[in-house]
């Protein structure tokens, strides 16, 4: 899978060695990244007006001092960002109930450290592709809403009857339009 050039992988991990290794791995695969040392730092980044206009994903350590990865994930859900920013949890302490709960809440994946570089990059690329699809759907929806808002009342009446499945002749009769 070809990475999306304008995509960003956000890395939140309290371990500087892990952050640096992940950033290096992603750079070697031509995937831009941005690193954060804590859940609070990433939460502040979001508070400063982050708007996901480009595909992205989040590599998120589960256990961190202060704001845990799970607490940050809940904050993403509350902000409505979890879908457009797929979350791949990283953990050195596999905990099946935690993994199951995170996936039930919408996490994209749950990877145990140490992980295979290739497998992780494959998951990241799939997450970015999912983000890109959702952002494209959101843009399309916004475009359709704009077009609908520009319709005249008469055009809306015609559209409503077309959507009800009426043939042109019946629409013309109902709206008293000559054919």
PLM ranges: what are they?
Residues 37-38, 68-74:
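Acidic catalytic/metal-coordinating carboxylates
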Residues 35-57:
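Acidic, metal-coordinating helix/loop segments flanking the phosphotransfer/catalytic sites
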Residues 142-179:
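Helix-turn-helix DNA-binding segment
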Residues 64:
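Receiver (REC) domain active-site loop signature in two-component systems and cognate sites
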Residues 60-61, 91:
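Active-site residues of response regulator receiver
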Residues 95-97, 111-124, 170:
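C-terminal output helix
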Residues 2, 7, 15-36:
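Two-component/phosphorelay signaling modules centered on CheY-like receiver
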């Amino acid at each position: 899978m070809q990475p999306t050039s304008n995509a960003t992988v956000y890395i939140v991990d309290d371990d500087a060695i892990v952050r640096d290794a992940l950033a290096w791995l992603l750079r070697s695969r031509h995937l831009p990244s941005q690193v954060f040392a804590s859940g609070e730092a990433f939460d502040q980044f979001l508070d400063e007006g982050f708007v996901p206009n480009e595909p992205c994903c989040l590599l998120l350590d589960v256990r961190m001092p202060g704001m845990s990865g799970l607490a940050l994930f809940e904050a993403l859900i509350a902000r409505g960002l979890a879908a457009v920013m797929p979350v791949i949890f990283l953990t050195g302490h596999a905990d099946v109930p935690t993994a199951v709960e995170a996936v039930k809440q919408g996490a994209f994946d749950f990877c145990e450290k140490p992980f295979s570089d290739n497998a992780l990059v494959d998951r990241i690329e799939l997450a970015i592709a999912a983000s890109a699809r959702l952002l494209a759907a959101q843009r399309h929806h916004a475009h359709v809403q704009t077009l609908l808002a520009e319709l005249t009342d008469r055009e809306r009446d015609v559209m409503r009857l077309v959507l009800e499945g009426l043939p042109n002749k019946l629409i013309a009769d109902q709206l008293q339009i000559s054919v």
